[in-house]
Amino acid sequence: MHPSDQTIFALATGPLPSAIAILRVSGSRAGDVLRALTGSLPPPRRAVRCDLRSRDGDLIDDGVALWFPTPASATGEDVAELHIHGSRAVAAALIKTLSAFEGVRPAEPGEFTRRGFENGKLDLTEAEGLDDLIHADTDAQRRQALRQLGGVLGDRARQWRDQIIEALALVEAGIDFSDEGDVADELMGPARAKIAELSAEIAEVLAEQGRGEKLRDGMVVAIAGPPNVGKSTLINRLARREVAIVSPHAGTTRDVIEIQLDLDGYPVTVIDTAGLRDSDDPVEQEGVRRARLRAAAADLVLWLSTATDASDPDVKGPEVWRVRNKIDLANGEVAESGPSQPVFRISAATGEGFADLLRELTRFAAQYFGSAEAGLITRDRHRRLLADAAASLTRSLVPGLAEEIVAEELRASAHSLGRLLGRVDVEDVLGEIFGRFCIGK
């Protein structure tokens, strides 16, 4: 029996013990399993309290069963849900009983969603939206994932693909009537107009500057500077807990420390880097090398120095802010800054000035992400396939191109959109996408 023909089961809820746990069963034998466990099938889509018993008749638990017959289920197959007490012993006994049924096996990660995809319950962009929703850390990410799960990109891609196929039909009809010049011209004119319109629409989406990808991946802020200027104290204050060792000895931080922040719904990763200085210690040298690499790759660098240090930042990046720390120890002596050099003066130890820095970080994050929720593209896969589709459309509009070549370019464009939706030739990416899901999803 092929694995896709087998009935699968998995725990669909979080770690045990818990108040309740849910086991999900999907496949052709789901009804047989449910009937064997409870004695009968409950009415479809109604929660029914029941005794769950082993095949020997021993009581496993007093639980709740739900029955979703095909095709009206999340996977498109027969699906049963068993709501039990969230005990490790209860779950283990039920899993042992399920494993004893012939043709029934534990599910692989993401296998329930993959079966839903294969049975037409959702397209590949919607499955990716579900994955993003599961992994969302902030409210903005949650909203974007829900839009993707709701089909915001998939619906547009389907519309574009349908219109390309309509234009292709006109082009092929023109080829069939190529001996009758007027008829062929009358068909090719509307086809080219439609192609130009579609090409402009997709180009507009591609010009969104990666807003959706930015929100999915988050913004990176690096804290950099010389040793002993309070970088670890600042990241601890941002994290509101101790994540880095604070020490008066230079070179304490040798590796990069990361924290995840939710700044007004925006996902931000803050990294604390090793103090930048010359050192004979090979371990510290490696830490400094990594610090420079991470700072250069960050979206924003907070260059930390003492309150009296007016030296220029020793890092490069798209955006570098000067942060003068330890103003509580400066005795009123704070270095000045030039007119084009805004400076934040703080005490990471006492919190003085920290609210102003945090407010500007939040403002910068909002500006960085922009109206990300209006973006359609959330993954590199989306951008690559849309770019391929747009390139084929552009090539099809080259003046004087033979109608047969135009038709071939339109087929290639429709094929790229089909790959985006998961309709054609995507077996190579399915394992990667669904493998990120939890077991039981």
Curated annotation (Swiss-Prot):
Residues annotated to bind Mg(2+): 232, 253
Coiled coil segments of this chain: none
CC cofactor note: Binds 1 potassium ion per subunit.
Protein name (database record): tRNA modification GTPase MnmE
Assigned protein family: Belongs to the TRAFAC class TrmE-Era-EngA-EngB-Septin-like GTPase superfamily. TrmE GTPase family.
UniProt subunit comment: Homodimer. Heterotetramer of two MnmE and two MnmG subunits.
CDD domains in alphabetical order: trmE, TrmE_N
Binding locations of GTP: 228-233, 247-253, 272-275
UniProt: (6S)-5-formyl-5,6,7,8-tetrahydrofolate binding residues: 24, 81, 121, 441
A GO BP annotation: tRNA methylation
Catalytic EC class: hydrolase
Protein origin, superkingdom: Bacteria
Gene field: mnmE
Protein role: Exhibits a very high intrinsic GTPase hydrolysis rate. Involved in the addition of a carboxymethylaminomethyl (cmnm) group at the wobble position (U34) of certain tRNAs, forming tRNA-cmnm(5)s(2)U34.
Organism: Rhodopseudomonas palustris (strain TIE-1)
Cofactor(s) in the UniProt record: K(+)
Classification via InterPro entries: AAA+_ATPase, G_TrmE, GTP-bd, GTP-bd_TrmE_N, GTPase_MnmE, MnmE_dom2, MnmE_helical, P-loop_NTPase
Disulphide linkage map: none
Enzyme Commission no: 3.6.-.-
